[in-house]
Structures are given as C-alpha cells and as structure tokens.
C-alpha cells in the first residue's frame, strides 16, 4: 500500500469515527431510513453521547421538530436521563413518538425503561413483548430492555440505573 493510499484510508477512518461514536449502544441512534431528518438532530445526539443533558435539551428545543418520532424520542430520553428526571414529560414525548411511529424501536425500549423507573413492571413487560414481536429476541433494543427488567426484578422490583 502506498503512502497516498494509507493517508486516504486514515482520512476516511477519521471522518467516519464520529459516526461510530454516536452510534454507541447507549446513545439513541437514528435508523438509516431517517438519515436526512437525523442530520438536524446530529448536534443533540453528540451532546447526548457526551451526557450534556441541558445542552442537548436546549438544542432539541431549538430544532423543535414535533412531527418527528426521532425528535420526540430524544426529548423523552434527555428528560428521563437529566440530572433531575422529568418522568411525566418524558412519557409524554415517548407517547408522541409512538403515535408518529408505533414501531420506533428505541422509543419502545426507552419507554419500557421509563416504566421501570415509575415502578410499572407490567407496562415495561408489554413494551418488551412489542419489541420482541417487532424485531425478535436478538435485536439490541429487546436485549437492553430485557436486561433492565431482569435487573429490576433482581433488585426486588426496584429500578437499577446502568449509569446511562
């Protein structure tokens, strides 16, 4: 491989690195079909990945794309994960996201986790059942919500945060 090819390969890898970082297992990722709409959410996603909840909330409010399931999902996520979680507002945004797209996998997972935070195991299990129907037992969101439910049960029906 020539130095020119090595440089081009390194440049391409560097350009793609932020994309991979933002698509980590813990941060909400945009489905490929929503890539164009997700561009305007990119800054908020970066702030979420950095756990800058207040900045992410400000950015999402600036974008104000209430007709987007992704936007509503991110609003719910930020409000649930912030320093002082607003569970009622988070639920409102998750519900809005699911009205727009009833198959939104991240919203199904995150709203299930919200229900665990609220002590509603039955609703969390219902979200898990929907996810299992949507994408099977092997999809990431199903596994994450199942693990959260297992932690909840193991802790005597108390929510256990993963630090995210």
Predicted features by range, described:
Residues 50-55, 83-96, 119-127:
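Structural signature of tandem alpha-helical TPR/SEL1-like repeats
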Residues 35-63:
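Alpha-helical segment of the N-proximal tetratricopeptide repeat
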Residues 71-73, 107, 141:
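TPR alpha-solenoid repeat register
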Residues 63-66, 100, 133-137:
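Structural marker of alpha-solenoid helical repeat scaffolds
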Residues 47, 79-80, 115, 153:
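Residue at a conserved register position within TPR or TPR-like alpha-solenoid repeats
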Residues 74-75, 79, 110, 144-148:
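Canonical tetratricopeptide repeat
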């Amino acid at each position: 491989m020539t130095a020119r090819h090595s440089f081009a390969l390194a440049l391409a890898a560097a350009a793609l690195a932020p994309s991979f970082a933002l698509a980590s297992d813990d941060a909400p990722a945009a489905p490929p079909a929503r890539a164009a709409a997700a561009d305007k959410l990119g800054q908020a996603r970066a702030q979420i990945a950095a756990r800058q909840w207040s900045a992410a909330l400000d950015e999402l409010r600036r974008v104000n794309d209430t007709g987007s399931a992704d936007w509503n999902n991110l609003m719910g996520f930020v409000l649930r994960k912030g320093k002082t979680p607003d569970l009622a507002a988070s639920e409102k945004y998750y519900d809005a996201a699911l009205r727009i797209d009833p198959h939104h996998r991240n919203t199904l997972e995150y709203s299930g986790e919200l229900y665990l935070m609220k002590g509603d195991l039955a609703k969390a299990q219902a979200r898990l059942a929907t996810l299992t129907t949507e994408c099977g037992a092997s999809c990431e969101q199903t596994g994450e919500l199942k693990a959260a439910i297992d932690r909840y049960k193991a802790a005597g029906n108390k929510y256990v945060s993963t630090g995210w």
